[in-house]
């Protein structure tokens, strides 16, 4: 009887976690840039949680992050990549501090990711 109660409690907890997984993940990831992530993820049909994960891995949510190779900002974009993405879209880009602008960085980074996804025909 005691074992059955424990199994039921564990099952209920697991069900709660599964049903609230997006909310739990949003608690784990900082969502300081949620306005931009949600907007550009939706525009490009990308799961916003994937974008949060990329930002976490690339810059740990530090908008001033810079790699030793020159990748900049939240999504760690190279100037050449950002320029290429911007020329194929309506996103304005100027070489310099643009990659440190969270909205521009996320807009360009999400679009770049969406383009890669499309090239690989991954849905």
Please provide the spans of the model-predicted regions.
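Export/targeting segments at the very N-terminus of extracytoplasmic proteins
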Residues: 15-64, 68
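Membrane-proximal soluble helical/coiled-coil segments
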Residues: 61-64, 71, 84-86, 109
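Early exported N-terminus immediately downstream of N-terminal targeting peptides
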Residues: 69-75, 80-82
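Alpha-helical segment that forms one wall of the substrate-binding/catalytic cleft
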Residues: 35-38, 42, 79-123
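Residue-level preference for alpha-helix termini and adjacent loops
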Residues: 60, 73-76, 98
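Hydrophobic membrane-insertion alpha-helices, especially the h-region
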Residues: 4-20
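Active-site phosphate/pyrophosphate-handling residues
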Residues: 49-52, 72, 107, 111
């Amino acid at each position: 009887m005691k074992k059955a109660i424990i199994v039921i409690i564990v099952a209920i907890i697991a069900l709660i976690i599964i049903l609230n997984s997006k909310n739990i993940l949003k608690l784990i990831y900082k969502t300081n840039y949620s306005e931009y992530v949600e907007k550009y993820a939706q525009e490009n049909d990308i799961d916003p949680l994937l974008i949060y994960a990329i930002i976490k891995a690339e810059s740990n949510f530090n908008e001033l992050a810079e790699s030793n190779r020159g990748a900049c900002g939240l999504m760690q974009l190279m100037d050449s990549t950002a320029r290429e993405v911007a020329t194929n879209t309506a996103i304005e880009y100027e070489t310099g501090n643009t990659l440190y602008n969270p909205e521009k960085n996320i807009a360009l980074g999400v679009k770049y990711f969406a383009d890669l996804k499309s090239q690989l025909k991954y849905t």
